[in-house]
Amino acid sequence: MLRHVMDSYDPAGKKHYAGNGQAAGDEDGREEFLKDVCIPIGEASFPAPFASGLEYSSPVRGTWNIVHTGMLIPEAHEIFICGAGCLRGVVLTAAEMGTQERFSTVAVREHNLLDGDMEELVIDGVTDIINKLKKRPPAVLVYTSCMHHFAGCDLDMIYARLRERFPDIDFTDCYMNPIMRKSGLTPDQLMRSRLYTLLKERDIRPDEAAIIGNDLPTDEDSDLMLLLKENGFKIHEITSCRTYEEYQEMAGSRFYISYYPSAKAGGDMLSQRLGGTHFYLPFSFSYDEIEDGLRRLSDVLGVPAPDFSGKRQACEEALEETLSLIGQTPVAIDYTFCPRPLSLARLLLDAGFNVERVYTDGLTGEEKEDFDYLQAHFPQLLLMPTVHPKMRFLAAKEPSDYLAVGQKAAYFTGTDHFVNIVEGGGMIGYEAVLRTLSLMREAYLEKKDMRTLVQIKGWGCESCV
């Protein structure tokens, strides 16, 4: 393991600070520089420990974006309509995925705004693209942008016209709209809900369940999958659909189950539209919360609750095994690894691990109990943002001895010993605890090429990079 040295510089380039806790120069200046980006949880506010403002984007690209997620609908074609500058990122994503044949763009130019023909541009642009495709897609995802909202475009009319022109194609509205990030549904919530708007009503089958809202497939040996399989349910998941017809079969499911927080709103919408029952199973590292969620799900499904005997003991033994291996190695966790980083920090700290940092830009309501507990019992735990402008100067320049759980924690601490998973990686239940600990042991023993891996877009999806 390597010595931790995190070098950082002030924006003016006049002072040098050593991120290992030893001042190199003006200690008062260092403390002033760090005070709003390095907050002990005992002094932090909930749910927004950091001020919102200008944001920094690190070169960590493992989380999925709207291009990756839309491609989960098999055989569908994506059409993005926005300015050329904004198109650059999504075009590169499609190219990196090797899915250019399922991806098209329409560039909005200044004269379109001035001439007031934004609606016509969308309708005619989409029409031209569809007519030139070698194969007619069963579905088209049309992504409009903030420009259409600023211009007051009649989106309902646009989609009505497209459906009239192409009655054999299913259209849905998707958005590349950063102005929606601070109110209403977030872009992530909205995109996950759009995945299921194309499902058409059909007869409901009582012995079928759909796991919805995930970018990554649910682990086959997770508590959720075992519960469904052991009780004879046919399981649908968009990640396993290979044809558009397979995708449509999800509509007949009696139960919709989500466990990623951003998928909850979409599950409620789907239930209201198609009539199935939606159940949200919270992702957590708390034994009590895991068992409570699975018991409540069993009640909804009308099946016996799982047998939890031995599960807690197995987790405790895995914690002891992992702690005996890594000892007091400093641990950093970030929100890209899973939706409940504070829950993981609480589990590890209670077991004696040396968790020093959690990288997160905001906290969800589900984390309030863990936040309060950590404030009371581990007030020294540091919360650090990932998008604050000062973080540009706080990424480690030299390798460190940290064990990181998550890509952004690895990047900011500069370690090659890290768990390389995003969005929970398909884990849920007790299996999430056991698999996370196994991955931590693996990360401690084996180095990865952090700076190369974290720059690959969309961990777990197709990539030709």
Regions of interest found by a model, annotated:
Residues 1-465:
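An N-terminal assembly and electron-transfer interface module characteristic of large anaerobic redox
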